[in-house]
Amino acid sequence: MAKLIISDLDVKGKKVLVRVDFNVPIKDGVIGDDNRIVAALPTIKYIIEHGGKAILLSHLGRVKSDADKKELSLKPVAERLSELLDKPVTFVPSNEGKEVEEAIDNMKDGDVVVLENTRFQDIDNDFGKRESGNDPKLGEYWASLGDIFVNDAFGTAHRSHASNVGIATAMKENGKPAAAGYLLEKEIKYLGDAVDNPVHPFVTILGGAKVSDKIGVIENLIPKSDHILIGGGMAYTFLAAQGHKIGKSLFEADKVDLAKELLEKAGDKIVLPVDNVAATEFSNDASREVVGDDIPDNMMGLDIGPKTIAKFKDILKDAKTVVWNGPMGAFEMPNFAEGTLEVGRALANLTDATTIIGGGDSTAAAKQLGIAPKISHISTGGGASLNYLEGKVLPGIACVSDK
């Protein structure tokens, strides 16, 4: 069922509550990466250009005590948003009470207000974690502040919080609309099509440290993918399952039997490294050498090798849909980043395919290479995109009204 989108609604003169994902890195009041703020601009601009009043809610980090509040205020985000929009943005240093209500009452059409970090509601109260625990009273309160609710925070779509599910539920109970913003719509379109209706050949590339993080994705995508290319630390659990020597490589001993089952279920769809870049210790300065799919006892695999890169590229060149989540090696160390970077370059060269990247390290690789503009879609949600690829229902999407 298609979801109600912000552009389906008349926002003129309306107070539009928008759950955005402004969970950006901030140190000493300086924003390290404003991509998530930039990603929310299309929805915010639609509201203000069509005469609506944009009231923005977001979490920032994990608030465990009062001491966290200073470092986790959204004030620097509101200031950066003002620069990006080239217009004043009002920051309210609270998200509940008279100060909030007065700020909203004073809004004119086209104004933007940013309320303080929603997770400040997770401390200093009798309920416990009011935001993260989805306190219905908090959801009802926030819903009372607006005429329309828009969820545009894909990064928290796999969570049931007061600021997404709570508000949407209260809105719909009062006959008010809960819509998706443009960013959420884009995530649903790209990830949804990849999972439910991919153009073949469909290649999934999975990396990262743990098989356990990706079990659901592998199980869901085995019947849908033509190939599943596996690199990173998780590859060594699969290689161990095949009886290969993995030396001191990272692996999950308790997941070897599961890896065997997945290999049997997938047949020849799962493609594992045929060679590896190995070193004697986990260090960028360690001496390294290319070894086959058996790793010497005194070494650990830290990247896929050149033959594997060539094999993966050969499979990718014919792909029409590609989903990539997780690095091919210890990408944070330049000497073991080549596999990840080469996979990124291969995706950038696919001009006639839908390419989707999810996960922090894969996204970082795309940015490092400068290939982001050549990728069809870079997902803004790590855990949320994995959950979606697993075929799970995401509460933050399910709570949005159907058309």
Swiss-Prot record:
It catalyses: (2R)-3-phosphoglycerate + ATP = (2R)-3-phospho-glyceroyl phosphate + ADP. GO terms for cellular component: cytosol. Pathway: Carbohydrate degradation; glycolysis; pyruvate from D-glyceraldehyde 3-phosphate: step 2/5. Signal peptide: none annotated. GO terms for biological process: gluconeogenesis; glycolytic process. InterPro entries: Phosphoglycerate_kinase (IPR001576), Phosphoglycerate_kinase_CS (IPR015911), Phosphoglycerate_kinase_N (IPR015824), Phosphoglycerate_kinase_sf (IPR036043). CDD domains: Phosphoglycerate_kinase. Substrate binds at D21, F22, N23, R36, H59, L60, G61, R62, R119, R159. Its EC number is 2.7.2.3. ATP binds at K214, G301, E332, G359, G360, D361, S362. It comes from the Bacteria. The keyword Transferase applies. SUPFAM superfamilies: Phosphoglycerate kinase. PANTHER family: PHOSPHOGLYCERATE KINASE, PHOSPHOGLYCERATE KINASE 1, CHLOROPLASTIC-RELATED. Monomer. Belongs to the phosphoglycerate kinase family. This is Phosphoglycerate kinase. It comes from Lactobacillus acidophilus (strain ATCC 700396 / NCK56 / N2 / NCFM).
